Structures are given as C-alpha cells and as structure tokens.
Amino acid sequence: MKASRSFHRIWKERDSAQPRLLETILYKDNFNRAYKRVKANKGAPGIDGMTIEEALPYLKEHQQEITDRIYRGKYTPSPVRRVEIPKPDGGVRKLGIPTVIDRTLQQAITQQLVPIYELLFAEGSYGYRPNRSAKDAILKVKEYAEQGYTFAVVLDLSKYFDTLNHEILINILRKNVKDERVVQLIKRYLKSGVMENGVVIDTEEGSPQGGNLSPLLANIYLNEFDQEYLKRGVPCIRYADDIVLLAKSKRASERLLESSTKYLEERLKLTVNREKSRTVSVFAIRNFKFLGFAFGRNGKGIYVRVHPKSWKKFKSRLKELSSRKRCQSIKPSLEKIKVYARGWLNYYGIASMKNNIDDINGWLYHRIRMCIWKQWKKPRTKYKNLVKLGIPEHYAATIANSRRKYWYISNNKAVIWALNKERLINSGFYDLATAYQSVHVNY
C-alpha cells in the first residue's frame, strides 16, 4: 500500500517539464510500434510461457487494463526468466528474459527515452545507439592513433550488467527524466526479480541482459564515465561495457589506468577486472584486442586488422560447417557457410586482410571439394562424375579407384579442374575473396 500511495503522490506532483512522458510512453501508437519491434526481434517466452504470437490477442483485449494499472501505480512487472549462455572463455553469460508483455512495455519506454538521451550521450559512445556501430568505434581508435594516441588503457568490467547500482542509476535518471512516474516504473523493472529453478530471487542490483530497456540503462549509467573523461580531455571510446582510453605515452596511460579504475569503483560502484585491465600499445597484436580487431602500421601508415583470436574462431567455425559429417548434402552446407561468412565479412570488412582471406578462401575451396568427393562415395560414381565434368576416362578411372585419403585426393589437379571455382560458385559457394573486395572497397 505504501508503494501505491507513493506512486499516486508522484502522479499528482510530477515535474511540469515532462508532465506527460508516461502518457507518451503508453500512447497507443507508441505501444503498437513497441510490439512490432519485439515481434521483429523474436525471442523466447518469459516465465508465463506466452509467445509473441499469443501476446497480440492478449494485448488487444487487455492493453487498456494494463495501462490503467500503470497509471494507478498497481502494475508489477513479472520476474525475468534466467538463461545461461556459454562464453568462449568457458564461463557463462547470464540473461534475464522478461515476459513478452514486459518486453513490449520496456520497448515503449525505450522509444521515448532514446530521443532524450541521444542528445546527452558522449561522441565516443558507440554501443546500442542508432546509426552507430562497432566499425565506427574501431575507425575512431584508428583516427586517434594517427594523431599520436598510440597507448591504450583497456578496461574490463566484471559482470557489468549484473552489478549496476540501482540507487546511483535512479539518481542519474532523475537528472533528465522529469516525470517521476517513469522513473518509478523503471525502478520496478529493476527490482522485478529473477526466477531461477522455480524460485524468485530478489534483484538488489543489476539490469539483466535480455530486456529491451537494459542496453539503454547501461549506456545511461556509463555516460557518467564518458562525460567525466570528456571533461578531462581524454579520448574515450566505448562500446557498451568495452572501454578504451587513449594516451600519447606509456606513463600517461598508466596514470589513466589508475584514475579510471578509481572512478569506476568508487563513484559508480563497479568492479574492474584488474587481471584483464591493462595499458598497452595499440600495435601490440597479442595484447591489444578491441571488439575483435587489432591495429598495425607499415610504410603507408596505420591500418585495421583482424585480431588473431578472431581469425582462429572464424576458421574453426568454417571447419565445423564444412566437416565431412555435415556435408552429407552439399547445398545446405554451402548455404550455412554463406550466411555465416557474409555476416562475418560485413563486420570485419573494414580490416586489411587480403592475403589472409585468399589463404582461407583456398583452404575452404579445398574442404568443399573434399566434401563433394566424399559425397560421391563409390568409385563408379566418382568415375562417372569426373568424366561428366571433362576428365579423360583413363585418368578419371585412376583417381576414382585411388585409396588415398579424401583430403589428399581433393587436392589432385584433375579434381581441382573438375570442381573449379566457377562450377562451385554456380553451385552456391560463397567466394570469400570476391565478397571481401566488395565490402572493403568502402574503406
């Protein structure tokens, strides 16, 4: 009852600067647009099991009832459903999946807060923002490096989304969200709890990844850090919780590491992972990695490169998609490779990597030939297909009856000629070298 009365008092005393922000959030057009965005993003049900498709008729019938409860201060968001996603380093990333109704409400709030905060966010913030990308962040680091900022402070925040201090966040929100009812509604989402193994656990800190509002709140929180270092004249590039500060000397970067760690831990009550946070030259290929990229320099200047760990992951995934076990039917495998490789190149296409791409492209052609050779199975089938593709009969017979391993035979000159690039491309092969040239030309 106390919370309800407080909400009613807030409703009467709301600041006149944004007297109808809550009404704007709950306006039918905004709400409908929010549902369409949630539907487009797809996603799993929350703790109530309601799917996105099932939510539409429910909202049509109950939308007025939901908005009335919010206006009266009686709406209580459902706890989020805990989901754990494995991380490459062996740990897990904890996600909190809200119900579809709560995702829609969070999206409706986000749509009205974004225009307010886009005017306030620092230029160096790139994550979860309209018309900004990881590529923009990387190109900004390159621009600073060309100006002599070649030493980096790489800051690693431990479990950032799970450790946002609610009191600090609410006070930050109040600076620019003048309708206190909206602040209180956001607070209810922060305090909604997490259901884990059938038990609801209170959330005293954090904004679980998985909600539509969480990315914006994460940016609002760390905007305090961005603005502080902007005032100090320090180049700060941030993508969500990946932070890089830049300096012109090793000594200056060491001072920055100390001061930034102190600010994050004392002012924002976050935990800096001291083992992973460090000062390093931006050209240290093994030690400097930002958003999967690294930097190099030669006689022509500074260039963007793909970090070795990103290369390793890329090749490992291609190897998995082109394994002999997966290539029982070659066309579906080629389509999966195309979808994955196209997405990878769209992200990493800003990097200079012609030689590396050529090497991987040749290796991938070899693997696809190996898959096709295995798919042909019997010597008789191999012989018929080789002859059909223009290989002389006596040579085709020798190759078809060879007991050499798939990898060796698939690199035979006759097999390479029979299954040449043009034929494989016509069958659906995604030529990495050609695709790279088309995406890299813009950089």
Where are these regions (language model features)?
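A conserved non-catalytic segment of reverse transcriptases
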Residues: K191, R267-E335, Y340-R342
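Short, charged alpha-helical motifs in flexible N/C-terminal segments and linkers
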Residues: K39, G43-T51
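Amphipathic alpha-helical blocks
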Residues: E54-P77
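Charged, compositionally biased N-terminal leader segments and the immediate start
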Residues: M1-D29
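Core structural elements
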Residues: L26-F31, P79-R81, P88, Q328-Y348
